[in-house]
UniProtKB/Swiss-Prot annotation:
Keywords associated with the record: Cobalamin biosynthesis, Glutamine amidotransferase
Superkingdom classification of source: Bacteria
MF (Gene Ontology): ABC-type vitamin B12 transporter activity; catalytic activity
Record has Cell wall biogenesis/degradation as a keyword: no
UniProt xrefs under Pfam families: CbiA (PF01656), GATase_3 (PF07685)
CDD domains per record: CobQ_N, GATase1_CobQ
InterPro entries: Class_I_gatase-like, CobQ/CobB/MinD/ParA_Nub-bd_dom, CobQ_GATase1, CobQ_N, CobQ_synth, GATase_3, P-loop_NTPase
Family: Belongs to the CobB/CobQ family. CobQ subfamily.
UniProt name for this protein: Cobyric acid synthase
Known pathway: Cofactor biosynthesis; adenosylcobalamin biosynthesis
Alphabetical GO biological process terms: cobalamin biosynthetic process
List of catalytic residues: C345, H450
Matching NCBIfam families: cobQ (TIGR00313), PRK00784.1 (NF001989)
Length: 496
């Protein structure tokens, strides 16, 4: 088997590559084809735990360990009805500062690559990237490949490992998508095409106009003029979708109000600079009566029923930022009034009394003091899926008692009771051994488990409601591209 490769390129970041790749995965899966997603390199602090080759108990060439990939490829794999694995995103860069990222190669952190200059690193990792793609091609009918940024970044072309080098290696049929809502869409499409070498232009099979608002007839005669200049047709005009139902790949989610009917629960998520795994809160946007918003100042948490401290790629630095904004006092006051506070992973660590770092992973410092816990950072990273059952949860979070939840862990920290405080009887109630605790008052909850709100049982327990399933989201995306692509284009792309 040698898969047909279909690649989604963009004229800019944010053009719509990720959601279109996801829609294509479900569309071709619905045609009865075996489909896998692929993105050579992703830069994101939104990651998921998936199968990785090797590890204790694995067969030769099999999967028995766990690793990380970008969340976008995880969701694309689910859309494709494929088992997510590290080959689908062989290189993941997790930013830790403006000029430094943790490098994850085939699911595992590589300290050597993390210290290596970017241009030198690209050539070193290309063989593993190509091998991962070739393996997926050998096992599937279709591989849907996502590019990154723009393929026409001419200053980066010589060291490219994520756009046209991948397209050439796979001889992929490429769709070039642009965000027409920003303006200048036809210039973006033509300029991107014109900056590519002739052999790479030949791989562009169609242009896609995304996020269109208005009367499509008003676009004429521009699509035909563009085709006359390039030989490439506009194969789809996709209407604006204010909420396609997928988590944002990077940055923060769109927090415009969408609660249907009366709002009964206002949830503020603290948006510190190195936030991670924010995609796990996407289901809350779709729960009836819930209003989800970002908090960057004390005013943003005023009137909130819940405050969530999400994961962080730099816990100590983000905690310092939080204090500089005055959010520490606002969160403490909210908790003192009995308001709910939830800390996930890095957020859990912040809620404790202290951060201790003897290995240079994150940093030392005092915590917020809302849970009598202390976190020690270790060089070894815990990466694994986890299924656990909440114990005797009390107070404001009592509806979680006895609920079994499927999630995942990605953390360097190990958290335990503060020894001195425990000796005096001030202890946190442990709800899941080594993973979840709450304060004696019952309104502050901290846990290492990501994915809490992606579990239907949790949503029912906390809100008495269900959010739309991911499968329904995938089907909606697939139906949308089937309507808006020109007839026959999607079938032709997948033909060998």
């Amino acid at each position: 088997m040698s898969a047909r490769c279909i690649m989604v390129l963009g004229t800019t970041s944010g053009a719509g590559k990720s959601w279109l790749a996801t829609a294509l995965c479900r569309h071709y899966s619905n045609q009865g084809l075996k489909v896998a997603p692929f993105k050579a390199q992703n830069m994101s602090n939104n990651a998921r735990v998936v199968a990785a080759p090797g590890g204790e108990g694995s067969e030769a060439g099999g999967f028995g360990a766990w690793g990380e990939i970008g969340s976008a490829q995880y969701f694309q794999a689910l859309a494709a009805r494929a088992v997510p694995d590290v080959r689908m995103n062989p290189l993941l860069l997790k930013p830790e500062a403006d000029t430094h990222s943790q490098v994850v190669l085939l699911g595992q952190v590589s300290d050597a690559l993390s210290q290596m200059p970017w241009r030198g690193r690209s050539e070193k990792v290309w063989p593993q990237i190509a091998a991962a793609l070739d393996a997926l091609r050998a096992e599937n009918d279709v591989v849907v490949i996502e590019g990154a940024g723009s393929p026409a970044e001419i200053n980066l072309h010589a060291s490219d490992i994520v756009n046209m080098r991948v397209a050439r290696h796979a001889q992929a049929r490429c769709l070039l998508v642009t965000d027409i809502d920003r303006g200048g869409a036809f210039a973006h499409l033509y300029g991107t095409w014109a900056l590519l070498p002739a052999d790479e232009r030949a791989l562009i099979a169609g242009f896609v106009l995304n996020k269109f608002r208005g009367d499509e007839a008003l676009l004429a005669p521009a699509p035909q003029m563009l085709q006359d200049k390039t030989g490439v047709p506009v194969v789809a005009t996709i209407p604006m979708q204010w909420d396609h139902g997928l988590p944002e790949e990077d940055g923060v989610f769109d927090d415009r109000a969408r609660a249907s009917g009366a709002v009964h629960t206002r949830i503020a998520v603290v948006a510190y600079p190195r936030i991670s795994n924010l995609d796990e809160f996407q289901p809350l946007k779709n729960v009836p009566g819930v209003r989800l918003s970002w908090a960057r100042s004390p005013a943003d948490v005023h009137g909130a029923d819940w405050i969530i401290l999400p994961g962080s790629k730099a816990t100590a630095a983000d905690l310092a930022w939080l204090r500089a904004q005055g959010l520490d006092a606002a969160i403490a006051a909210h908790a003192a009034r009995g308001g709910r506070v939830l800390g996930v992973c890095g957020g859990l660590q912040m809620l404790g009394e202290a951060l201790i770092d003897t290995v240079g992973v994150d940093g030392n410092g005092p915590g917020l003091g809302l849970l009598p816990l202390v976190t020690s950072f270790e060089a070894t990273k815990t990466v694994r899926p986890t299924r656990q059952c909440f114990g005797a949860v009390q107070g404001a979070w009592r509806h979680l008692a006895g609920v079994a939840v499927q999630g995942y862990e990605i953390h360097h920290g190990q958290t335990a009771q503060h020894p001195a405080m425990a000796a005096s009887g001030d202890v946190a109630r442990e709800l899941i051994p080594g993973l979840a605790w709450q304060n004696p008052g019952g309104n502050v909850l901290g846990l290492y488990l990501h994915g809490l709100f992606e579990d239907a049982a949790v949503l029912r327990a906390l809100f008495g409601a269900d959010a739309p399933t991911l499968d329904a989201v995938f089907e909606g995306l697939a139906a949308g591209i089937a309507r808006h692509f020109e007839p026959g284009v999607l079938d032709a792309l997948a033909v060998q």
